[in-house]
Amino acid sequence: MRVDTRKCKGRMMQDLNEIFETIKSVAKEISEVIKYADLGYTTHENATGDTQLKLDVQSDEIITAKFKALSCVKALVSEEKDEILPINTNGKFIIAYDPLDGSSLVDVNFAVGSIFGIYENELKPQNLIAAAYSIYGPRLELVINDKKGTKPKFYRLGKDGNFKFVRELELAQKGKLNATGATQKGWSKTHRNFINELFDEGYRLRYSGAMVSDLHQILLKGGGLFSYPATSDHPNGKLRLLFEVLPFAFIYENAGGTTSDGKSDTLFDVNITKTHQTSPCFFGSASEIALLHKFYGKD
């Protein structure tokens, strides 16, 4: 029996569009909740030991409820859930997400966001087929990358309550911004020398403490470097591969950028052995990652 591949591809795009529409709905709801939510802490910790904010849990519950309604979703994996949550045995896609990245900054009114990775059938780097993130700031913004090899698409919420396409995002070969994370006293000498070189070349420091907003700024401004290295207290980095790192690696590489853990040619080469695994990570234009490899001894 011959399979109609056009029908299969059409069904996949239909399912993905349903997922993206759900992400749009989620973004609008979380954006409203943030305005008036209780910003206190719960008595619980997530799988990586972070004490959960009530807003983290509320955002996670919103996303879970929305995606449970989709027959194409096989399972959900969240930064705020210890285990994978099965949804539909006949579903095809696993959604891995950070419900509210930078949530501890809401009390000082910084921009925060949600990150989504869409995996086909299995949670493997090569199975990540689409990614998206939303930004909750002065404006509600959304970036969707629906296919490998295509540029990420940037949207902004309009007065009519609908997201309006603004433009495709593309990184220049060399940028001007340097968003460097982790506590400096824990940096290696190699990393310190690398960052100092960027400043010596005239890069401007732009770091808020929310991964999603810092990476968003670099994308919109055309280039630069975001780094969260291995440190003495977090030798495997602190950012989570499935929920945060790989979705942004997908978007950055499709925007013409490059990613690395300091050793690899791409973050997609990192071997994942557990759901909440973390990794050092570097996202940037080609020039910044080439300089990274020079300092880290890859070349």
From Swiss-Prot:
Keywords recorded for this protein, A-Z: Carbohydrate metabolism, Cytoplasm, Hydrolase, Magnesium, Metal-binding
Note on how the cofactor is bound: Binds 2 magnesium ions per subunit.
Coiled coil: none
Pathway: Carbohydrate biosynthesis; gluconeogenesis
Necessary cofactors: Mg(2+)
Gene3D superfamilies: 3.40.190.80, Fructose-1,6-Bisphosphatase, subunit A, domain 1
Binding-site residues, substrate: 101-104, 207, 238
Keyword set includes Disulfide bond: no
GO biological process: fructose 1,6-bisphosphate metabolic process; fructose 6-phosphate metabolic process; fructose metabolic process; gluconeogenesis; sucrose biosynthetic process
GO MF term set: fructose 1,6-bisphosphate 1-phosphatase activity; magnesium ion binding
Main location: cytoplasm
InterPro entries with a match to the protein in the record: FBPase_C_dom (IPR044015), FBPase_class-1 (IPR000146), FBPase_N (IPR033391), FBPtase (IPR028343), SBPase (IPR023079)
Localization annotation: Cytoplasm
GO CC, alphabetical: cytosol
Catalytic activity: beta-D-fructose 1,6-bisphosphate + H2O = beta-D-fructose 6-phosphate + phosphate
Binding site for Mg(2+) 2: 98, 101, 244
Superkingdom in the source lineage: Bacteria
HAMAP family: FBPase_class1
UniProt similarity note: Belongs to the FBPase class 1 family.
Self-association state and partner proteins as the record states: Homotetramer.
Protein name: Fructose-1,6-bisphosphatase class 1
Organism lineage string: Bacteria, Pseudomonadati, Campylobacterota, Epsilonproteobacteria, Campylobacterales
Gene name for this UniProt entry: fbp
